[in-house]
Amino acid sequence: MPVIFMERSLLDSLTEADIKEIIDENEGHTKYARLEGYYEGDHDILRHRKKDSTAPNNRLVNNMAKYITDTATGYFIGKPVVYSSQNDAYLAALQDIFDYNDEQDENMELAKGASINGDCFEMLYLDEDAQIRFTKVPPDGCIYICETGYNTPMAAIRIVYSKDKDKNIIKKVEFWTAQDCWYFRSINGGALELLDIREHYWGDVPFVEYINNEERQGDFEGVITLIDAYNRVESNTANFFQYNDEALLKVLKMGAVTSQDIAEMKEKGAIILEDGGDIQWLIKEVSDTALENYKKRLREDMHIFSAVPNLTDANFGGNLSGVAMSYKLWGLEQICAIKERKFKRGLQRRIELITHI
């Protein structure tokens, strides 16, 4: 979901055509699709092609992106958020709403989404029983519009795709301001048609942004090139072994032989050559030490630059003192401290919207 900034005076003068233009320019942000793909295991290596179609072309995905996000998210919000208030009745009413929305799971998914994409969004609405609900919005399903110089929203655009009974692709668009909501629809990629404008009672734009950091950068976004390099070297290692498993046999001065002769040689486990003859496999050679050192360096760099440690490393054994362990986790503690401050801001806005309605 891209975040765009504009002057408040421009928002007040937006026309139906302006809203359509904003959607056309910002829908389907490629950054989010790529990051979501990497988390789910859809890496660039899977689209790698070789010029020689007969050569081994293993495409191995080592999903460090998922490891980084799952580890950082679990460490950050594995324990549920605890709320406190001097007003016990208010806190109890708020907790009822949270329980109704399975707030603990929602928070986990929001934190994971922010870890992947750098930010994540939530929409508040009233269900058919007039109960307050809040739900995560898919990263490619919304456009967040903020006033220049501020992070609070002036408007938000929600986009939902579906199919009707005739399998037509229906695109529904909602343009939310603090006062009303504009409803649009298009069929099979046609022009958006304004259907209705309705007032709402939230008193604000009912959307919340949860950011991972001030730069809105995902936890593994900065190490994607390292992930790609590791995927390549692992794939090439597999190619190397497969090539050697299927290596050609070079034979010099074997003389005239028949298929029967070859069958007998296989049975006896011996090959008879003429004088000066030779036989050897055509194999590739590689330095195991150099290869393993290179892979080790890539793994270490991914952990260093993501600040997410390798928890399976032998150095995380049970013999570490508390001080030594804190040093090992220092980088992760720092990024989680940033996450906590940013996530708290989103939770506060959620509570403000709930309280206002």
Predicted regions and their residues:
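Extended, regular secondary-structure scaffolds
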Residues: 121-215
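Short amphipathic alpha-helical segments
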Residues: 86-90, 98-107, 114, 222, ...
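Extended, helix-rich architectural segments
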Residues: 1-135
